[in-house]
Structure formats: structure tokens, C-alpha cells
């Protein structure tokens, strides 16, 4: 029997909120400095305008989460309009993730000033190390990211509270220049919206009702970002200019000399890349600032890791949907798509080496995220079948037009950013076209391989069991669930056990994938999994020989233990049988112990039998 591999909905708002902050809130670490650099003592007006936009975008994404409870990211929502539009939006989001990884890594090493190498080289090395770790598909990285996010909120709040007595002394100047220049400066800090797509991608695993969970996750994070950004902007404006140019590192002095920064602009350029660190030092103390800088750097590095895995996920999902070659969907033994991982590491790595400047990376950053958000909003408001109220559709349409205006402004004023995003989109669309052409040629020439004997047998199993979905235990027959990838000893042991109890055996084959799924779960396709086909045929033959009724369940999941428990509960089994793992200490360290995870969450009425 072939069943849908739905992911368990276990993500509560108090889990999703810190995860969202880890993506969305990270931008504070470079947006504040960029705002002060571009707008100087007029920064407050631009931050107020950005706060209004953040509130609007946050509200819009709470609506998107309601509309798409199984995944509302740009790739998922745009597919309702056009698959080509979905691919275009996904590639823009991919460009965003490339620069997220490069910029976050670079800024991390501006906050912690390490010796011997430049921040760009340290950033490249950190991306490479994270890439190596991701070969093993670590599942515990999320917990570390949550800790870093919570600590960042605490440290940022301490800085904000310490600065409150000085806010009355903030030097706020009127806007100078023309409205055109104001608009240009505003688009320079638009990357503050980056990370909002994360919440839409989480809806597929959110606790129902998804609308309520998403709303509770979004609004506390949004309020924290808006309020603290405004307080910290006032805190920047309250500091004397001399405080920004004290005790500068040799590297910053050298950089400003190379850039020929005018003397009057040095206070605004000096800490563009580590503004929160200098605020911590000025308002709290040097020791606190050093500790805070490490925490901020860890959050930035966790953002690098998230961007890399999300970039892998985009490529994997497109390959799964036959938009990229099949090799992009190939998993290593750790459940990680290897080819997408290599690309997701090398592209940001070379980006940060070729563009070793936070300001220039910020230019590249903005065009990707703004484009992805514009496509997502535009897809929603133009899909007339969606249950949107008139005022909701109107407000989201205004936001979509605004995002498009910002996108075209960036494309016009920063042609290098357009060229960067265009190159990524062009490579992606070309690869997609070649993939489609190859499939067409295969069909025409008759080279598409027909699924033979093994899959025929699986087809018989499917016909006997019916279509996907849990089979109700109407006969109250005893059921065992066996989690296996085809171990003959474990299969035979389970059949012997079942024969003694006159039980039916459900054999569960879990194909592990170690990347987040940025969209609704698709029906697992066993036709693309030769190992599962072989296991299904072997189990069918052994079951017939033993005279025991068997069913074969196949799914793809990112958490093996949770999936086993979910199937055990869904199918009402009385016993779960698992073999001892041959995987070593490294697997358990990176991913956790499967048996321990099952034992902790299995209902008391269900026995767990471990076969050595």
C-alpha cells in the first residue's frame, strides 16, 4: 500500500515565533547601520516608513498563511497562477537566499573581529564549514538557532532599555533633498522585510487552526522588530558623532581610507556593519558589547545555515516537480540532496569573496527578496477563487504594486543587482528548459523506461489495499507496525511475531530527507525509489510465504521518529517493531536517536519492541 506522507502538525506559535525571528529579526543587525549610513540623522523618518511597510507586509503574510495552510511560500502560492511564475518566484527567492548567506556570514565577522584573515575570508570559510556539516543533514541546528534568536532578543532589549534615558537627546534632522532621493534612500533599507517568507513556508507543519497559529507567531515578532528598531534608531541619533569614531579597528580605518570617505561622513560609515555592537558598548558597557557581539554573530551564522538549507530545499522541490534534472533530487545516505547542497554552498561562498562589502551585498540582497514578495502578493490578489474580502484584496493589491515599484527602482538604480538576480534566474530557467526538452525527447523516442516486474508487484499491493490513506481497523485485527528499509532478519522476525498473534503487519519504509519542505507535501513516488521497490517486493514474497497479511507503507519525511509515531497512531497499531540502528555516534549526534524519539512519544497503549 502506498500512502501520502503528510508531515505531523506539531509547530506551535511559540516555536514558530522564535524561528521567524531567526530569519526576519536578523536583518536588524545590518539594517540599522545601513539606515544610519544612508540617511544619517534623518534615519528616524525612514525607519518609521519602513515600520509601516513591515506592519503591512506582516499583516499580508498572516492572510497568506490563512489562504495556504499547507504552505504559502512564493513557490506554492504562485503555482495556482502558473508553474512558470512559481519557478520565476522561486528563483528570485533563491537569489535572496544566496545573498542572505553571503551577507549574514560577512556581517558576523564584522561583529566578531577575528585576526589573521579578512572578514570576507572568514565568512567564506564559515559557509564551507556549514556546508560540510550539512552533508550529514543535522536536525539539531534548529534548536541552536532558537537559542541564538532568544538571546538576541534579550541582548537587544537590554540595549534598548539602557538607551531609553538618552532618547530625549536624539538629534533628528528634517529630510533633505527631493522626494525622489527620499524614495531612493528608502529602497536602500528595504531588506528589512527579508525573512518574512519563512512564516509562510512553515504553515504545512503548524498546529491547526493554522490561521490562529500563524497570527500568534507573526504579530509578537513584528511588534518586537518595529518597536525595538525605532528605539535603537533614536539611540543611534542620540550618540555624539565622536563616539562612532573612537577606538576604530585598523581594518575600518584602512577601508575608509580606500573609499576616500570624507571626514564629516566617517561617523556614519565607521559602524555601518556592526551598529548594534557600538550601541551596546556606548549604552551598556564594553564587556557586555563583546558578549553581545558573539551572540549576534551566532544568530547571523544560524541565518547562513537556514539560507543554505532553504536554498537546497528550493532546488529539491523543483527537481521533485520535474523542473530541474533528477540528480537534484538525489539524496545521500544522510537524507541530504547532495548536488543542491554543493551549489548552495559554492554560490554564496564565491559571492562573498567577489563582493566583500556589506553595502554592495545589501544592493544584491534587496532585489531578490522584494521580487519574491511581490510575486507572492500578486499571485494571491489575482487568484480570484481565493476567499479574500474586498478590503483585504484591495490592501494586498496596494502592497503588491508598492513592492513592484520598489523592485523596478532597485533594478533601475542598481543595474549590478539586476544583473545578479537576472543571472540566477537565467541559469535556473535555462536548466528548466533543458530538463523539459530532455523529457520531451525521451517520450518521443520511446526511451522512457517502463516500470517492470517489481513495480507491477507494488501495483498489485496498491490495488489490493486501495488508494492512499489510512486503512481503518474495522475487523479489530491485531496490527503491528514495522519500521524498516528491508532488513530480511527484521522482516522475518516481525512475520513470526505476527503469526503467533494472528496479526496484520504494516511495513513502513521512511525515506529520510534532511531539508525543510517549502510547500505542501506531495504524494511520495515510490517509482523514483529503487530501494523501496526492492523492499516492497521482498516483503510481499516473504509475507505470502509466511501466510501473514502484510501492507507496505512508503513515505518521505524529515523526522523519522515523529513519522513512525504518527503512522502508529493513525493506523491504531498495538505494537511497533524497530531494529537496532547500525548508524554510529555521528548520526545520533547530528540527528538524534530514532529509537529514543519513538519511545518518548509513542502512546502508552502501544508497545515498542526492539529487535537486536
Regions found by a protein language model. Name each.
Residues 471-529, 542-544, 551-553:
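Small/aliphatic-rich secondary-structure junction motif
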Residues 73, 217-303, 327-352:
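TM-loop-TM module centered on a large, flexible mid-protein loop between adjacent transmembrane helices
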Residues 146-201, 207, 223, 235-261, ...:
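Helix-loop-helix junctions that connect adjacent transmembrane segments
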Residues 144, 327-338, 373-415, 446-451:
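C-terminal membrane-solvent junction of multi-pass transporters and transport-like membrane proteins
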Residues 32-90, 99, 103-127, 222-225:
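Extracellular loop-to-transmembrane helix junctions
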Residues 127-163, 176-177, 218-220, 364-375, ...:
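Membrane-interface loop-to-helix entry segments
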Residues 1-31, 76-78, 84-87, 181-186:
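Membrane-interface "cap" regions at the ends of multi-pass membrane proteins
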Residues 84-86, 120-125, 207-228, 316-353, ...:
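Loop-to-transmembrane helix boundary motifs in multi-pass membrane proteins
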